[in-house]
Amino acid sequence: MESFIIEGGHPLSGTITPQGAKNEALEVICATLLTDEEVSIDNVPDILDVNNLILLLKDIGVRVERNSKNNYTFCAKEIDLDYLNSEEFIRKCASLRGSVLMIGPLLARFGKAVVAKPGGDKIGRRRLDTHFLGFKNLGAKFVHSESNNTFEIKAKRLKGTNMLLDEASVTGTANIIMAAVLAKGHTTIYNAACEPYIQQLCRMLNNMGAKISGIASNLLTIEGMDRLHGTSHKILPDMIEVGSFIGMAAMVGNGMRIKDVSVENLGIIPEAFRRLGVKILIEGDDLYIPHMPHYQVDSFIDGSIMTLADAPWPGLTPDLLSVLLVVATQARGSVLVHQKMFESRLFFVDKLIDMGAQIILCDPHRAVVVGHDHKVRLRAGRMTSPDIRAGIALLIAALSANGTSRIDNIAQIDRGYEDIEGRLNALGANIKRVNN
């Protein structure tokens, strides 16, 4: 197990470029299973979750060529379907949440998939019902195996239908789309997620020969095809990493430029930071965050406390609430952070309280933050990263703290952030990776 040793108080300045979007990468890499032709994907982030998914595809027979650091070619011409029932495959799927996105493509093209309970973040109950109900609506059958506690999902050929998703799940929508593009007939999906990741997946599939309309809305119509062909695709910049860098620039920045962010796909993210008083300048496709000795939290017109709450797109992504909460600890004013979509993503705040942050955890979903206005720096401490987003939030806190901090279990951070210590050290941070 590895840890970060962070010497706090070093200002960050310079230019940084975000990696490719993790969530989009997981979706489009799994979509390569839908064709026996080559698919080239550019701007693939070099992070743990994506690398493990690529290894899993190799295990089932996908030919993978790494053309450069962030460019891959996939060819799923020959797939070992028997391997899907192996203990090794089931064990690997159970430790990688992104593996659930393989089900839709495998079911659509080969009529068979196996699902184990996937792993990932410990952030409460993440339902897979949306995925499974969607597959059932398309005609799939589920057979439970008590011996290894898995479900084998089968269908001779999926059939298009009309369905209303019980929640606008991003991965659920992606999985159902990938299943429906090879189904017989038309499929209509109401209450579909419409994040940029989903839009990108749909555009890639259309370039492969699929017929998907309603892209960027929550009503998708899909005409099933007999087969899809190869294509090339470029992944968007990671909006979550962009938001993380904005948070760092606010807390410890001395003038930071975030390059090539795809501004039109950031949605409400810049505005959420502006509500905390963070100054963000949009210059072409870059964001520039100047040095700010203070930032003042906005208030509502009626004078009530500023509230930041997550919501399905185009609302605020839940993946950035942890970062916004940390930024609020040094703001001038108070903020209510309301995490609606997961019930234990705020439990890391006890570590911030130990560092001197003024936070009241109201319940598993809500926390009130009273900012220090940069008058009192956080204290250094030793922490453990519980999940990707809390991990990066703790890293931001440690960068701003007085003294040297240690963050354990940084594999959680590595799951979502590429060479984070190297890139931040280039801006002036002092972060060392150590083996325990």
Task: Show the residue positions of the predicted features.
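Short, structured segments at the rim of ligand-binding sites
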Residues: 1-436
